[in-house]
């Protein structure tokens, strides 16, 4: 089986919520592919497709949750191959969440997984997160960066609010801020004073490494 076929089989298993198949294919892929490639082009690719189908009303929340569970199991099976920081990082500590009023979770969850697999210590605080919770968690874990996702134009302002509260708390110089999500852009990131904008999970990893090097 070619690498492309392995990755496609993995993506299909995620879409079908077949956890046992995911684990079996991950084991096969371990000897041929890097963990980051297995996650990005296999597991995350499948989860992205689940997200697309969910947004179009073709899949429902229980299916999404089962697919996410299968992806989590796949990532856990790769833990022994991940960089030494993946479970207690020295690359940097990142708090990642989706702002209050926004219940979208899939894209943010994929970003968290990719960052963790790259060697960051990631604290995923979920979706629909109150602004202050981002700051409190950052203080608690001594975060180097906060990732703020917003998937709706109506919740985009929450990204700006997190940055403003960081300033009020005297933490802005210490904590980097990355923004992302469908309505976010580089221009928006510049406008609100974020340190960077990431269009996707792969870019998020690259930007985080660049900022926290």
UniProtKB/Swiss-Prot annotation:
UniProt cross-references to SUPFAM superfamilies, sorted A to Z = Cobalamin (vitamin B12)-binding domain, Methionine synthase domain
Q: List cellular component terms (GO).
A: cytosol
Q: List keywords of the entry alphabetically.
A: Cobalt, Metal-binding, Methanogenesis, Repeat
Task: Give binding positions for methylcob(III)alamin.
Answer: 104
GO MF terms held by the record: cobalamin binding; cobalt ion binding; methionine synthase activity
Which one GO biological process term can you cite for this protein? methanogenesis
Query: What is the top-level taxon of the source organism?
Result: Archaea
Q: Which InterPro entries match?
A: Cbl-bd_cap, Cobalamin-bd, Cobalamin-bd_sf, Corrinoid_p, Dimeth_corrin_MtbC, Met_Synthase/Corrinoid, Meth_synthase_dom
Give residue ranges for domain B12-binding N-terminal: 1-90
Q: What pathway or pathways are given for this protein in its record?
A: One-carbon metabolism; methanogenesis from dimethylamine
Question: Which PROSITE patterns does the UniProt entry name for this protein?
Answer: B12_BINDING, B12_BINDING_NTER
Boundaries of each B12-binding domain copy?
A: 91-213
Q: How does it assemble?
A: Copurifies with MtbA.
Q: Which family does it belong to?
A: Belongs to the methylamine corrinoid protein family.
UniProt function note: Acts as a methyl group carrier between MtbB1 and MtbA. Binds 1 corrinoid cofactor per protein, is subsequently demethylated by MtbA.
Q: What is the name listed in the Swiss-Prot or TrEMBL entry for this protein?
A: Dimethylamine corrinoid protein
Origin species, per record, is Methanosarcina barkeri
Task: Print the organism lineage.
Answer: Archaea, Methanobacteriati, Methanobacteriota, Stenosarchaea group, Methanomicrobia
Task: Identify the gene encoding this protein.
Answer: mtbC
